Amino acid sequence: FLAARRVGTGGRVIGVDMTIEMINKARGNAERVEAKNVEFRLGEIEHLPLADATADVVISNCVVNLSTDKPSVFAEAFRVLKPGGRVAISDVVAMKAIPHELTESLLAVAGCVGGAAQLTDVERMLTEVGFEDVRVTPRPESREVIAGWMPGTSAEDYVTSATIEATKPGGDCCEPTCCA
């Protein structure tokens, strides 16, 4: 609901989740905090239930690593963004090759480790779909937290939390309200 506060009463936030349980939970939370400018849609990150060029910002928190089709995730974000729109993602990325025992472990995949893409691959995928100003910023302070996810696996030696940002080209608006 941080996004709902950020866009103010004139803005609108659309939350997407692939499970009806999370949609219902989000709707209940929205009612509880009296958020009037939010709506929730059932959908997958690889097939967003939004029209082309309708969003100013696409935000995702620790979901991309769970997708088996990461290029489609980034292509969908590009599709739904207006020209000049931005992606802001917090996710787990690999800093080096992840051992097979972690990429094949259901616990590691569910724990956001096994499906993490290499940092350089994330940059490449974003650029290939057309994004500009691509920045993937590792967060080394996440090491201790990641170590606690799967004790004894050394997962923290392979992955880190990262902030992923990029811009869809074409936004030439000079007004202070554009994509704010």
Question: What is each model feature region?
Answer:
Residues 4-5, 71-86:
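A short glycine-rich, Lys/Arg-flanked "PGG" loop and its adjoining helix->strand segment in the class I
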Residues 19-21:
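Conserved SAM/SAH-binding beta-strand->alpha-helix loop
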Residues 93-113:
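Short, glycine-/aromatic-enriched active-site segment of Class I SAM-dependent methyltransferases
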Residues 125-180:
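C-terminal lobe and adjacent flexible extensions of AdoMet/dcAdoMet transferase-like proteins
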Residues 26-27:
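Conserved SAM-binding loop
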Residues 56-69:
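A short SAM/SAH-binding and catalytic strip from SAM-dependent methyltransferases
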Residues 1-9:
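Conserved SAM-binding loop of SAM-dependent methyltransferases across substrates and taxa
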Residues 35-36, 46-58:
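A short acidic, Gly/Pro-enriched loop at the edge of an enzyme's catalytic core
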